[in-house]
Amino acid sequence: MRATEFIAEIDRRGFLGALGAGAMAAAGVPAEAKPRKPEPMAFLSAHMEAEEMLHKTALHAGMRGAELAQFLAQCYHESAGFGRMHEYASGAEYEGRQDLGNVNKGDGVRYKGRGFIQITGRDNYRRAGQALGLPLEERPELASRPDVAAKIAVWYWASRVRPNVANFNDTRAVTQRINPKLNGLADRHENFKDYKNMFVATRTGT
């Protein structure tokens, strides 16, 4: 599901109903837009709650405008529409990766990617935990909780992305700080435009 479709679905469920059809049209969201893959209400609702939590955490951290749109777009892509809080693979491929701090047997699986911006490896869990005052090294599964994942994503952004990006309209530069191989670059950029247009139309995100 593209971010445009996600935003349209939020409106149909009443979360953005007060904005009116004009605002949604200005955001580039067709009134008849439908997800490519219909999702059960409970599943979709969980996605919306995760997005709302992430959005609020980012606003509290001072993100606005293009930076906020880019942050949400990147998290949307990384977490498959705010619905996947851990990577599909088992993590066995990270076994023995000393560059990630995986020095003990089983560390690859234990510290596989989790969260909106998925952190991977014992060292990254330790750093995030120390920065946030959370026992992530001892309890890595906490990184899959939306409230914790939102804090981790903002921490990662503030420490790894923001200091290294001069222009948040540059999706390539932002993506390089999150996924150096630039996987899904076109999708990330389209979602960035969707969020940016929504902020303009609804006068939010500023």
Where are the regions that the model predicts?
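Boundary at the C-terminal end of the N-terminal hydrophobic targeting segment
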Residues: 31-33
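N-terminal carbohydrate-binding/catalytic regions of secreted carbohydrate-active enzymes
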Residues: 51-54, 58
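Peptidoglycan-targeting cell-wall enzymes and recognition modules
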Residues: 36-48, 73-156
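N-terminal secretory signal peptides and thylakoid transit peptides that target proteins
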Residues: 2-22
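Acidic helix/loop microenvironments that form the catalytic cleft of cell-wall polysaccharide enzymes
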Residues: 75-78, 166-185
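Low-complexity, Gly/Ser/Thr/Pro-rich intrinsically disordered linker/tail segments
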Residues: 194-206
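Proteins synthesized as precursors that undergo proteolytic processing into mature forms
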Residues: 148-150, 159-166
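Surface-exposed patches in mature extracellular/periplasmic domains of secreted proteins
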Residues: 62-71, 84-88, 163-175
